[in-house]
Amino acid sequence: MSLSRPPRVLIATAGFGDGHNTAARGLAKALEGQAESLVTDPCEEAAPWLNNVLRNGYRFVTTYLPRTWKRIYNSVEHHDFSRQKIPFMRNVETAFAAQVKRFNPDVIVSTYPLYPYFVERYIKGGGRPCPMVTIVTDSIEINASWRKSPTDFWLVTDRETKSSLIEQKLPEQKIIETGFPVDPIFDKLSPVPTDDHAKPFRVLYFPTASKSSLIPTAHAILEHQPWPVELTIVLGRNFRRLYHLTRKLVDAYPNRVRIKGWSRRVPELLCEHHLVVGKAGGATVHESIAACCPMLIQHLVPGQEEGNLELLRRIGAGDLAETGPALAAALRDLLSDRASHWHRQKHRLSLHARPAASRVAAGFVLELAAKARSSPAPN
């Protein structure tokens, strides 16, 4: 192996939820100029049509059939991932092994729990060994697919998650608390100050695909509050589905509602707003924490997102508000007494925010790569 070339880091991700891709991109950006990194989605590359069907199915079930999803999620606790039984994943594993062989990485990083099992079988089949790092994109409540992963290290989002994994008998020396690897730009941005007067109070809203919840949620935010509130709605992939409804809000509340489509400025938007409302996905929750922006959870996916909500509650920076009345009441509570509760949440977030987490994770990966490159190759 030539030590004259930059270290090579293969970062494997998946599109089942935004957290995996957000973590992969954040780490890759932090590695720029220090390593040759390749971000790959093995599921997308091996079977793009089927992968798209499965992703859409995942979003549908988690949005409209949460109880069904919880049963699926809980069943994973008893699944043996060391044996490959799904034909679709066999094709993915074969394609991934070929990519590993071509790229010849010094370290493999996975932001999705299944890929370390692929790497283990690849090495057992004669592939070149290299360190395996798993970035756990959930918090506190960690699924068996992550915990049983045959990895050298788990990078986790916070102290509570590390403690949770240690309690479940994972080796402490293999659990590295780096924070969620958000975009490195967070470390350069200035959040809304803790002592901001919050007038008008700017709310950033990430709606789900559900048409039935958008208007009631917006009304709950915009009406019957102690002082002026402005709303920015980021539609993202739901732009076509929800745009006509959001236009009605723009007309109903002149100069108080803004619409964003697919935005690359999410870090900046989070740092410009006083509150975020959305689902409790790992990406949104940890980006909100990095931006010191309190959060109200309007949609909770049972299972993996329950730990993210618990983390917000332990920090003292957010809570669940799934109905219109609950959301309106939570917002009034934040804004009462000159927004004293909001100011307290901002202060709590300032003690827990990790806007440089991706650089911390990148430093760990680079150190691991250096050790691997300096070690003699196994016979």
Regions found by a protein language model. Name each.
Residues 26-103:
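Conserved N-terminal ligand/cofactor-binding loop architecture of enzyme catalytic domains
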Residues 285, 289-329:
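Catalytic binding pocket for nucleotide-activated donors in carbohydrate/polymer assembly enzymes
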Residues 271-281:
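Acidic donor-binding loop of glycosyltransferase active sites
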Residues 197-273:
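Donor-nucleotide binding loops and adjacent catalytic segments primarily
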